[in-house]
Regions:
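RNase H-like, Mg2+-dependent phosphodiesterase core
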Residues: 1-203
Length: 203
């Protein structure tokens, strides 16, 4: 006598429920800076990563971000994507940000089953299930982790530029339009790292 059909359905449900969900969080940094690339990070957190300590990178101190960045990198799958100042000038900052996100996602060495992205726009990617979440960096640990890694990575790059272009104090303003930075631009002009499509650089 054969087994009842209901057992087959039950087994099917159990099998489906056991499918592992792989969630990736994605965020970008540096959109408002007057210089350099916009950075994006994609992060798949491991179970060993402490999600409770992950917060939006903007509300963390520099020291906190650097400590958390090391913790995240040690306990996750992650990747960085960038769009250069030239790419930003060629199109616009939104499209460049989405391109950086796309590059970060494509560099992950494991394919996520779902991608959660900070903001209200999605990059153009096939074969990925994606969802945009406004203020996701404040709500979703995976996105918070991405914001931290992206922020630390970009800040280190800008600080490295400041050693050569010390007149602009990029190690302090990180390329943003502070009064001191604008005065330095007026006095010394611009160089190849500036986003020429950005006000007040654009004339």
């Amino acid at each position: 006598m054969g087994r009842p059909k209901k057992n087959k359905k039950k087994n099917s449900r159990v099998k489906n429920s056991n499918l592992k969900k792989i969630i990736a969080g994605v965020d970008e940094v540096g959109r408002g800076s007057l210089i350099g690339p916009v950075y994006a990070a994609a992060v798949i957190l491991d179970k060993s990563c402490n999600r409770k300590i992950l917060k939006d990178s903007k509300i963390l101190s520099k020291n906190q971000r650097e400590i958390l960045s090391k913790h995240i990198k040690k306990n996750s799958i992650w990747a960085i994507g960038k769009s250069s100042a030239k790419e930003i000038d060629k199109g616009n900052i939104l499209q460049a940000s989405l391109l950086a996100m796309k590059r970060a996602i494509n560099k992950l060495n494991k394919k996520p089953t779902k991608i959660l992205i900070d903001g209200d726009k999605l990059p153009k990617l096939k074969d990925f299930k994606m969802k945009a979440i406004i203020k996701g960096d404040q709500k979703i640990p995976e996105i918070s982790a991405a914001s931290i890694i992206a922020k630390v990575s970009r800040d280190k790059y800008v600080v490295s530029l400041a050693r050569k272009y010390f007149k602009y104090s990029w190690d302090k303003n990180l390329g943003y339009a502070t009064k001191e930075h604008l005065r330095a631009i007026k006095k010394h002009g611009i160089n190849k790292h500036f986003r020429k499509s950005f006000a007040p650089i654009k004339k």
